[in-house]
Design a protein with these regions (language model features):
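Donor nucleotide-sugar binding/catalytic pocket of nucleotide-sugar-dependent glycosyltransferases
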Residues: 117-119, 132-170
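N-terminal subdomain of nucleotide-sugar transferases
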Residues: 1-45, 50, 343
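A conserved, positively charged/aromatic
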Residues: 104, 110-138, 249
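Short hydrophobic beta-strand element within catalytic cores of glycosyltransferases
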Residues: 277-282, 286
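Nucleotide-activated donor-binding/catalytic signature segment of Leloir-type glycosyltransferases, i.e.
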Residues: 222-240
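Aromatic "clamp/platform" in nucleotide-sugar-dependent glycosyltransferases that forms part
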Residues: 260
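Conserved donor-binding/catalytic core segment of Leloir-type glycosyltransferases
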Residues: 172-199, 327
Length: 352
């Protein structure tokens, strides 16, 4: 299958979860034998107009992210590539519309990867780009609902989750045994207060906790742990790479999710795959609760006292280091769902 991915600004220009997700999908598809080309602004040095990396061809539409020039050149370049499917990042909306023109010239369906962190403006051009997409892919029901509220139809949307590496989960050694782990960038949406207040309720019990992540609010949270007199049992591990996180998760018994905003709770998923019991504090702007709806080793809570209660209750569950029920989220399984979606869209496009 020939797949054209369109992202004027790749993660080399602007590192966001949505861009990284689209690029990871491209990498997975290329590894599975598909012909994948990313049409983007040039991010590599030199004068070559394309670059090969991880089995993907990156083709420069423009030297820098210049919207007018990019939009003029993109449709013809897509038509010459003759893709079976075009997969686009939703911003800028003008680029998404240009991708639609190229897809139409190629007689290929246009799919839009709408992760939820793109900050798409609510204007006429963005609305046209949304309506022009044959399928809008979101990571969760929360984001799907937001897209529907902007005018997308139910048939026009699909939910495909973030993916994880179950082989890595199996291979990495478990870290030191701890009771509770939390992971999120320590910013204004982290809401570590709920966890710390819950832990403070258990001050008289023996427990240990690790907080993974760094950010502008780290000093504030460290001071709060000290004010609650639990800083001797809370370790702030800072930013950790994926392998380090997996090791910590495999040594932990409970993962507590309290962040105010999550398009998809990826760290919660990794932790549950590593055997952790999931405790999710419901937040209106977070999709985390969606991950635990059908799971036995998980609890949904609404306040710090309930967090404390469920941490205590979790002591009655056995410790695990791998949960094979999360295999449905493995990279290969999610990639197969993208392939199925592509094939369906190609088939539907061929009917008209």
């Amino acid at each position: 299958m020939r797949v054209a991915v369109v992202a004027m600004e790749t993660s080399q220009y602007r590192d966001t979860v949505g861009r990284t997700r689209l690029e990871r999908v491209a990498t997975e598809l290329a590894a599975a034998g598909h012909d994948v080309t990313v049409f983007c602004s040039q991010w590599w040095p030199g004068f070559d107009n394309q670059r090969e990396r991880d089995g993907i061809t990156y083709r420069a539409v423009t030297v820098s992210p210049t919207v007018p020039s990019f939009c003029v050149r993109l449709p013809v370049m897509l038509a010459r590539f003759r893709p079976d499917v075009v997969h686009v990042h939703p911003t800028p909306a003008s680029v998404a519309l240009a991708a639609k023109t190229g897809a139409t010239l190629s007689r290929a369906p246009l799919l839009t990867e709408w992760f939820g962190d793109e900050n798409v403006p609510e204007n006429r051009r963005a609305g046209l780009a949304l309506q022009a997409s044959d399928c809008l892919i979101t990571p969760s029901e929360l984001v799907r609902t937001r897209v529907r509220e902007r005018g997308a139809t139910a048939d026009q949307t699909a939910i495909l989750p973030q993916s994880i590496d179950m082989d890595l989960v199996s291979e990495v050694d478990a870290g030191e045994e701890i009771d509770v782990v939390y992971a999120h960038r320590l910013d204004g949406s982290a809401n570590v207060e709920s966890l710390l207040l819950g832990l403070a309720e258990l001050r008289q019990k023996g427990w240990s906790a690790t907080i993974i992540g760094d950010g502008p609010e780290r000093a504030h949270y460290e001071q709060e742990a000290a004010d609650l007199r639990i800083d001797d049992r809370v370790t702030f591990a800072g930013a950790c790479d994926t392998e380090e996180r997996v090791s910590i998760y495999k040594g932990a018994h409970v993962f507590v999710q309290t962040a105010f905003r999550e398009c998809f709770a990826t760290d919660l998923l990794w932790a549950m795959a590593c055997g952790c019991i999931g405790i999710v504090e419901y937040q209106a702007e977070s999709s985390a609760h969606e991950l635990i709806e059908q799971r036995d080793r998980a609890f949904r809570v609404t306040n710090p006292q309930e967090i404390a209660d469920k941490i205590t209750e979790s002591a009655g569950f056995e410790r695990r280091t791998v949960d094979e029920s999360c295999a449905e989220f493995d990279h290969a399984q999610v990639r197969a769902r993208y392939e199925d979606l592509y094939e369906k869209q190609i088939e539907d496009a061929g009917l008209f």
